Design a protein with these regions (language model features):
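An alpha-helical repeat/solenoid feature that recognizes helix-turn-helix modules
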Residues: 1-60, 64-194
Length: 194
């Protein structure tokens, strides 16, 4: 193994120890919830059971991607916004990867940021938790379901700040529909209570 390969291996291992196992691609060495949901869905559809180690190792990454401080106590630093500290919120929704949201951030009074939860990632999170064998009585699942109920819509991908950018709420709208449909199919729910 070359020094570069060894360094990359070390970075990946450190990320996994801190944030759990996920799936990603490209040169930046970090996984994301979008890719993870399809990897776990492929495992499930190939016959893997909820107790499969791949599902169980993914749980920590799912927790780190959820705005639920009871399971996500980590903080991160936002490279795009003057390296500001990013902490978990408590709305129960999900972000693209730990500390990062395509929907932007909310700045708290002390200057720290909370990555905004949004629809497509919250459905991806819920679907993955179900693949890993968690049920609706689990607080992580219940929090994601509560976010979905509070933010239910088929007009936009909820969670994006349309006041800042009127086009933002349409970001990934068809992807949102796909995530919503696949997730609700996994829950067995025919209706969402709002």
């Amino acid at each position: 193994m070359t020094v570069t390969e060894n360094s990359l291996h070390g970075v990946r291992r450190l990320w996994a120890e801190m944030n759990g196992y996920g799936i990603g691609y490209g040169n930046d060495l970090r996984p994301d919830l979008s890719n993870l949901q399809y990897a776990l869905q492929a495992l499930k559809e190939s016959g893997a059971k909820a107790d499969d180690p791949a599902f169980q190792r993914a749980i920590k990454f799912l927790e780190r991607s959820q705005n639920l401080s009871e399971v996500n106590r980590n903080s991160y630093y936002n490279r795009e916004d003057d390296n500001k500290k990013v902490v978990s919120g408590d709305d129960g929704g999900a972000v693209y990867y730990p500390g990062n949201s395509m929907a932007g951030y909310v700045e708290l009074e002390d200057g720290t940021l909370v990555a905004r939860s949004y629809g497509s990632m919250t459905y991806a999170l819920l679907k993955c938790y179900l693949f890993a064998g968690l049920d609706i009585t689990d607080p992580r699942v219940a929090a994601a379901l509560a976010w979905i109920e509070r933010n239910w819509t088929v007009e936009v991908n909820p969670g994006f700040n349309s006041l800042r950018d009127p086009r933002a709420a349409a970001q990934g709208l068809y992807y949102y529909y796909l995530s919503l449909a696949q997730c609700l199919g996994e829950t067995g729910k025919k209706f969402v209570t709002t």
